[in-house]
Structure formats: structure tokens, C-alpha cells
Amino acid sequence: MSNPTVLDQIRHIIAQALDKPVETIHAEQSFRRDLGADSLDSVEIVMAIEDQFAVEFDEDSTAAVDTVQDLVTYIEAALASRGAQTA
């Protein structure tokens, strides 16, 4: 069995936080405009992602995230950077 992708894991976190079916969460969707997330939802999502991936967001990073794909890209870069630092 393969590991879930970063996108899959993030989709599940968002679906749980927003109480939506995971099938309705897509990479190109905007958190606020398309998914209806408010600032409290965003905090909940960020905290869950920080726990899941053992990464931390700074204020500038969270301000730059608009879509699900933006979040995936940020997490993948953080994981790659962490991997490069431990290699």
C-alpha cells in the first residue's frame, strides 16, 4: 500500500476542518472564495497541518497561501528543505 500524497493528506485535513466530503476538495480551490473557510477555519487547518507534517508556518507564509495547491507547494518545499538539511 502506498503512502498518501501530500495533496491527499491536506485534502483530508481540510475536509475534516470544514466538515465537507473529501471528494469536494480540489487543488485549485481557494480556501476563502471556493471553500468558505474563515480565519478560524484557517487557523485550525494550519495547526493540523503543522502537527501532521511537523512543519511551522510564519505569518508571511500563511498570507501567501490562497489555494489548496499553494498549501501543497509550501509543505512539499518545507519537507524537501528539511530533508536537505538532514542529508
Curated annotation (Swiss-Prot):
The name under which this protein is listed is Acyl carrier protein 3
**Family note:** Belongs to the acyl carrier protein (ACP) family.
Q: List the HAMAP family hit by this protein, alphabetically.
A: Acyl_carrier
Name its pathway: Lipid metabolism; fatty acid biosynthesis
**Which residues get modified to O-(pantetheine 4'-phosphoryl)serine?**
39
Q: Does the keyword Transmembrane apply?
A: no
GO terms assigned for molecular function: acyl binding; acyl carrier activity
Compartments where found:
Cytoplasm
Q: What is the lineage of its organism?
A: Bacteria, Pseudomonadati, Pseudomonadota, Betaproteobacteria, Burkholderiales
What role does it play? Carrier of the growing fatty acid chain in fatty acid biosynthesis.
Domain Carrier: residue ranges: 1-79
Q: Which UniProt keywords apply?
A: Cytoplasm, Fatty acid biosynthesis, Fatty acid metabolism, Lipid biosynthesis, Lipid metabolism, Phosphopantetheine, Phosphoprotein, Plasmid
Q: Gene Ontology cellular component?
A: cytoplasm
PTM entry text: 4'-phosphopantetheine is transferred from CoA to a specific serine of apo-ACP by AcpS. This modification is essential for activity because fatty acids are bound in thioester linkage to the sulfhydryl of the prosthetic group.
Recorded superkingdom = Bacteria
